[in-house]
A protein has these predicted regions:
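Alpha-helical structural motif
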Residues: 3, 27, 55, 70, ...
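Intrinsically disordered, low-complexity peptide-like regions
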Residues: 5, 62-63, 71, 95
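Conserved short "hinge" loops at termini or chain/domain junctions
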Residues: 1-51, 84-102
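Intrinsically disordered, low-complexity N-terminal regions enriched in serine/proline/glycine
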Residues: 18, 60-62, 73, 89
């Protein structure tokens, strides 16, 4: 399922119109920026299902005007995702360093 369709489903949107489409695009862009900032880097929302689920949830919170509640309600998931993201980035950096020294 396409990410935009998944977000629409998460928000309970079953109709299509230009206003709603534009609103979902703006919310998705905002949520992507927020999560990338929280993770300390760029998340791959196509392959990282943990980050993808957080993105869908954050979009739902923003859509329902409850963005300020997201961090509190998803603190454990955000911490786990950030740790995983940082570990992956560290491993990539270590691998690149190893290749440069060979």
């Amino acid at each position: 399922m396409a990410l935009s369709d998944e977000i629409r489903q998460e928000c309970g949107i079953t109709w299509e119109d230009e206003y709603t489409d534009a609103k979902i695009q703006a919310i998705t862009a905002r949520a992507t920026g927020i999560l990338n900032n929280m993770m300390g880097g760029t998340c791959d929302f196509e392959t990282d299902m943990q980050c993808r689920q957080l993105l869908c949830a954050l979009c739902r919170y923003i859509y329902n005007n409850a963005a300020e509640e997201f961090t509190k309600n998803f603190a454990m998931e955000l911490t786990a995702c950030r740790l995983q993201h940082q570990a992956t980035e560290y491993a990539k950096g270590a691998e690149q360093d190893e290749q440069q020294t060979v």
